[in-house]
From Swiss-Prot:
Pfam family, one: OSCP
Matching InterPro entries: ATP_synth_OSCP/delta_N_sf, ATPase_OSCP/d_CS, ATPase_OSCP/dsu
Reported function: F(1)F(0) ATP synthase produces ATP from ADP in the presence of a proton or sodium gradient. F-type ATPases consist of two structural domains, F(1) containing the extramembraneous catalytic core and F(0) containing the membrane proton channel, linked together by a central stalk and a peripheral stalk. During catalysis, ATP synthesis in the catalytic domain of F(1) is coupled via a rotary mechanism of the central stalk subunits to proton translocation. This protein is part of the stalk that links CF(0) to CF(1). It either transmits conformational changes from CF(0) to CF(1) or is implicated in proton conduction.
Subunit description: F-type ATPases have 2 components, F(1) - the catalytic core - and F(0) - the membrane proton channel. F(1) has five subunits: alpha(3), beta(3), gamma(1), delta(1), epsilon(1). F(0) has three main subunits: a(1), b(2) and c(10-14). The alpha and beta chains form an alternating ring which encloses part of the gamma chain. F(1) is attached to F(0) by a central stalk formed by the gamma and epsilon chains, while a peripheral stalk is formed by the delta and b chains.
Keywords: ATP synthesis, Cell inner membrane, Cell membrane, CF(1), Hydrogen ion transport, Ion transport, Membrane, Transport
Gene: atpH
Record-stated family: Belongs to the ATPase delta chain family.
A single MF term (Gene Ontology): proton-transporting ATP synthase activity, rotational mechanism
Bilayer topology: Peripheral membrane protein
Domain of life: Bacteria
Protein name: ATP synthase subunit delta
Protein's organism: Colwellia psychrerythraea (strain 34H / ATCC BAA-681) (Vibrio psychroerythus)
């Protein structure tokens, strides 16, 4: 099995790098999942193992995949067919999923402040957020004088509003109720 993983690794890496560049990681994951299921089918495995020509294997595989795989995915499968590697698609999928998991460990955090955040503050903030989120943090800093003072931190669904503007808005809401 480790030999198949070794064979699959460069294909998975190439597919993942392309998917990242094209901002289509989820689309590629769906396509590779479908193609891996096709490669696991006993009839397809039998045909590919029977000594079919590269052209026959490529044609059959692309016909079975049909519109489930876009043109870039088809090109990827053609390369795998030419190199007689279609049967390692399940391992390519496993490697792709592992690369995606590593990739997703980074979270993009938007930090808005009334004044520019210093390099020292960025370092301290990054360390604190990495500890809290248990992920590598990429800070995107913005300046918005309307928040008066403090910070507004947004990471995915999480929002920490430590701005004076936010505190005043919460106070106004409390006083109105």
């Amino acid at each position: 099995m480790s030999e198949l993983t070794t064979v699959a690794r460069p294909y998975a890496k190439a597919a993942f790098e392309f998917a990242v560049e094209a901002k289509a990681i989820d689309s590629w994951l769906v396509q590779l999942t479908f193609a891996a299921e096709v490669a696991k089918d006993e009839t397809i495995k039998g045909f590919l193992s029977s000594g079919a020509s590269v052209e026959q294997a490529q044609t059959l595989f692309l016909n079975v995949c049909g519109e489930q795989v876009d043109s870039q995915g088809q090109n990827f499968l053609k390369v795998m067919a030419i190199n007689e590697r279609l049967l390692v698609l399940p391992q390519v999928l496993e490697q792709f999923i592992a690369l995606k998991a590593d990739f997703d460990q980074e979270v993009s955090v938007d930090v808005t402040s009334a004044v520019e955040v210093t390099a020292e503050q960025k370092t301290t903030l990054s360390a604190a957020l990495e500890k809290r989120l248990a992920r590598k943090v990429k800070l995107n800093c913005f300046v918005d004088a309307s928040i008066v003072s403090g910070l507004v931190i947004k990471a995915g669904d999480m929002v920490i509003d430590g701005s004076i503007k936010g505190k005043l808005n919460r106070l106004a809401t409390t006083l109105q109720s």
